[in-house]
Amino acid sequence: MSNNIDVVEIYTDGACSGNPGPGGWAAVLLYKGTKKEISGFEENTTNNRMELKAVIEGLKALKRPCKVNLYSDSSYVINAFKEGWLEKWQKNNWLKSDKTPVENQDLWKELLEISKNHQVNWIKVKGHADNEYNNLCDRLATEQIKRNTRQNPKE
């Protein structure tokens, strides 16, 4: 890849009300002083699925191959790349070391496919701390849950 490759910062977060339950995801993309916020909702999901969905949608929002600094407070997402879990899972036909199937294979496979287009640096951030963009993602994700469940209270 050339030296002229764009560098983009992507912050992501997922949230779930109950696990499983209604969930929201969000990503904030930063590029040359421009900020783009994206978020979405799923009716019945898990926190880990929302964390993965946030990363997938953040990367999908890129229009061309980029160098990406991707920030997440999800150990599940970051460790899968940093600790080599994904390579092991693929080598073992998507089975964990205890021989049970890896959860969320559909999203992991989608994430692997889309991340091939980019040079991704996976960065763990502390959740609910003082990181402006991680906190923004958290607010956007939880707002999706509130907005989409307000009409259908379960109580």
Swiss-Prot record:
- Localisation: Cytoplasm
Cofactor annotation comment: Binds 1 Mg(2+) ion per subunit. May bind a second metal ion at a regulatory site, or after substrate binding.
Look up the EC number in the record and give it. Answer: 3.1.26.4
Positions of Mg(2+) 2 binding: D13, D138
- Detail which positions bind Mg(2+) 1: D13, E51, D73
Among Pfam families, the record links this protein to: RNase_H
Any single biological process term in GO: DNA replication, removal of RNA primer
What reaction does this enzyme carry out catalytically? Endonucleolytic cleavage to 5'-phosphomonoester
Question: What SUPFAM superfamilies does the record point to?
Answer: Ribonuclease H-like (SSF53098)
Function description: Endonuclease that specifically degrades the RNA of RNA-DNA hybrids.
Q: How does it assemble?
A: Monomer.
EC category = hydrolase
InterPro entries, per the entry: RNase_H, RNaseH-like_sf, RNaseH_domain, RNaseH_sf, RNaseHI
> Cellular component terms, GO, for this chain's entry?
cytoplasm
Principal location listed in the UniProt entry: cytoplasm
Give cofactor(s), names only.
Mg(2+)
Q: Which UniProt keywords apply?
A: Cytoplasm, Endonuclease, Hydrolase, Magnesium, Metal-binding, Nuclease
Query: What GO molecular function terms would the record report?
Result: magnesium ion binding; nucleic acid binding; RNA-DNA hybrid ribonuclease activity
Protein name according to UniProt: Ribonuclease H
| Similarity section | Belongs to the RNase H family.
List residues of the RNase H type-1 domain: 4-146
